[in-house]
Amino acid sequence: MLFPVCLLSVPSVRAQTKEPASTSAEELHGGIEIGAKGIKSVAVRIVGDERGYSVNILNADILNTTIVQTKNGKFTPEAIRDTGSVTQRFYQRLRQDYRIPPEQIHIVGSSGLIGDNSQDLAEEVRKRTGQEMTFLDVETEAQLRIAGSIPRRYRIGATWYDNRGVAVLIDIGSGDTKGGYQLLRRVAGGAPEYDYITWGIPKGTVTFTNEISKAAGETADYQTFAKRAQALSPESVRAILRNEVARKPGLINRKRIYLSGGIVWTMMTLIRPEDRSTFTPVTADDITNFYNRAITNPEALLNPDLSRIRNKALRQEAEREVESVRNTFTPKNLIAGAEILRAVAGEMRLAGKQIYYARYGYLAWILSYVRLQAEK
């Protein structure tokens, strides 16, 4: 079982600085996450003190790749080569710009990587970096995401309350959908501990897009694609979600919901671009609104009117993020992801609950992983 960790909120991944030469090399750590839709790289400084550990993010980079592309169940040679090249570039930057020792850089593959030839990808990474690549299973990745995405406490007035005992994480990725919660366990003669209850289904925004395209045809128009998504969802998405809920009642009994993942980021960027808070409130109506717009006119949804944002700096930041969305997801990805999001909202009964978008949840598990390695 993984030990709970508490990560600091990321103020801005654009605030990137090189670490001064006086920093001890033992404090510098790096992580490279290879996921279904892209690669993330983080450089962090981890310092131990009497309260535990503090984490300072020095740099965070993200670049989309084609690794999710498969042929006959295998990653294509082009996808492997592309991913290896980006990984090498990120690795060299961690070594040269941030002077992180090679033994303190960890290259990790997401559970959303679905291909029968993962060893070919690992060999490409090893050839380009000299580093071994670790692959996570769904349960371990979900544990890391929970620890990194859900704040340990919340406050009402002047009183603090335990948050992880009443909250659940839902992460809709490109390759799968997963999450979970922590369950308090009393220990005789000692302090209470948390167990992780995790869940996951092999359906994500891109994998479901591929499934719909196979059924509807690669050249299907958006209306046909949306109808096929609606037809596939009951058995392909909702049925397996319902099975997870039946086995893990905490998924519907908890009242505080934290959402993360690419399609959630896309939704919040497109329907509420001016809100930059770390934990942004979301409603079930927001999800319904996003879904209806995605299935009726996804291209219009990808081009929101940002002129209403009066603050120039905020508007420019929103413009950059909207452009990132357009570079990451196609209109058909929007339709598929919105269908999964609607299924999650229905099967997990999100209406009436306190829902939050964890803005920096996309960095959660790689930061948690790096920190756990540093604590060994």
Specify the residue positions occupied by each region the protein language model found.
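Bacterial N-terminal signal peptides
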Residues: 1-9
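An exposure/low-complexity boundary signal
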Residues: 9-11, 103
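Boundary at the C-terminal end of the N-terminal hydrophobic targeting segment
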Residues: 13-17
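Short linear motifs in intrinsically disordered
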Residues: 18-20, 228
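Gly/Thr-rich phosphate-binding beta-strand-loop-beta motif of the actin/hexokinase/Hsp70
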Residues: 21-55, 156-194, 262
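Conserved phosphate-binding loops in N-terminal lobes of ATP-dependent enzymes
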Residues: 25-132
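Helical "lid/coupling" subdomains associated with nucleotide-phosphate turnover
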Residues: 70-98, 115-117, 121-165, 188-191, ...
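Glycine-rich beta-strand-to-loop/alpha-helix junction loops that act as flexible
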Residues: 109-113, 172-177, 257-264
